[in-house]
Amino acid sequence: MIMRYENQKKHKNHSLCSSSSSAMAEESSFDSSLPFFFLFLGNLGKFFFLWPLKDLDLPLKFLDFEASLCKSNCFFVKTLSFLPSYDKISLDSSSLEYDFKKASHSGIVLNSTKTVPLNFLFL
């Protein structure tokens, strides 16, 4: 586990809390001061956590949310492959690709303060 997102829908704030896992050390490129947001792909039933990488040319890294909530109402996160472009994402656990150019429906992006609709064609 790398980190977890605390689901606080009953409160108006969303927060990010670090895990004590040693895997966090492997993710040295994560900069918690940079903006972050969350993406939900409705037809895949997948949540993704995205953040900018400060030491690589790749714009974002995707993390796949575990399907179930933990007892403390947190989404636990596991690493997925890097995203070389905005056109598609490859889910390494299932070899499933999602082509944003062919997508015509909207998803949801959660940042630290609000929830907004997202059209995948403009991601």
Curated annotation (Swiss-Prot):
It is found in: Membrane. This is Putative uncharacterized protein YDL050C. It comes from the Eukaryota. Partially overlaps LHP1. One of its GO terms (cellular component) is membrane. It is a single-pass membrane protein. Its main location: membrane. The chain crosses the membrane at residues 34-53. Keywords: Membrane, Transmembrane, Transmembrane helix.
